[in-house]
Amino acid sequence: KSDKESCPAEGESYEANKKEARIVRVYVEYQSESSKSLINEIRVLGTPSGTPVQETPAVQVEDFKDSKYNVTVTDQDTINEVKGIIERRIGAAYKDWFTFELADAENGYDYYDLSQSNGKIHIKGNNGVSLATGLNYYLKYFCNVNISQVGDQVSMPESIVPVEGTVHKETTFPVRYSYNYCTLSYSMAFWGEEEWRNELDWLALNGVNVVLDATAQEEVWRRFLTELGYTHQEVKDFIAGPAYYAWAYMANLSGYGGPVHDTWFTERTELARKNQ
């Protein structure tokens, strides 16, 4: 139905053209006249087709403890991740401009030090985010390079710009937080690995160390509802579509925009683990 006329008292009928159906969904997508959009009754009439219902195979998502991501992260792994930011954002050739060192601060604060050692820029900090933030400080204030969420200016100087003495920066704020649920659904509902990688690079470069990343939370819901005894189809009907997760996770709605394909659960879980 696409017109603005109300249904007559006896209702309106729509032919399915002898199609077989196991589920009938009715979506109310748009109502511009007012905020009231009502459905009083729906009757589905037909005869049994005799076609057996195809069983839905179980969704197989590997537990984290059994996955390749369940590993201990070493200091060298952390330094390699920071070097990965250099390679992705300004070019692999510039990795040799820098050396990195991880060391805790005596006062317990997050910090970084910039200095020059053996002709290279030495960045010292207490964790990977601190190292990345120090890297960004050097790029911004010594090289006039700007890395942002929407575009980069990465015209590097021809040679290393020296750092005189030591530049020391620290923060007394242990948590630097980013996002809320609405951000994830407005901007990131269908982000893949590349978009998330660019964003996580930018967050680390700017000192953010706590990120609300609800990627694959639908898999948590799938497992939880399954353990409560709901069928696979009932679970999928409850979970909203990707563009509406913010409102579903804030308990404002359920099911709207769904269901998602079974592969969505496995693919999003894989993405979430890559993002960690």
Predicted regions and their residues:
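Aromatic, loop-rich ligand-recognition surfaces of beta-strand-rich domains
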Residues: 1-4, 8-56
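Short amphipathic beta-strand/extended segments with alternating polar/hydrophobic composition
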Residues: 2-3, 55, 113, 125-126, ...
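C-terminal beta-sandwich/jelly-roll accessory domains of carbohydrate-active enzymes
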Residues: 6-7, 73-77, 81
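Residue-level marker for the onset of beta-strands and adjacent loop->beta junctions
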Residues: 10-12, 108-110, 119
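Short beta-strand/loop motifs in extracellular/secreted proteins, especially
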Residues: 22, 96-98
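Acidic/histidine-rich, surface-exposed loop or edge segments in extracytoplasmic proteins
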Residues: 59-71, 116-118, 179-184
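Feature activates predominantly on carbohydrate-active enzymes
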Residues: 77, 81, 85, 91-93, ...
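Extracellular/luminal ectodomains and secreted, surface-exposed scaffolds of diverse proteins
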Residues: 98, 110-115
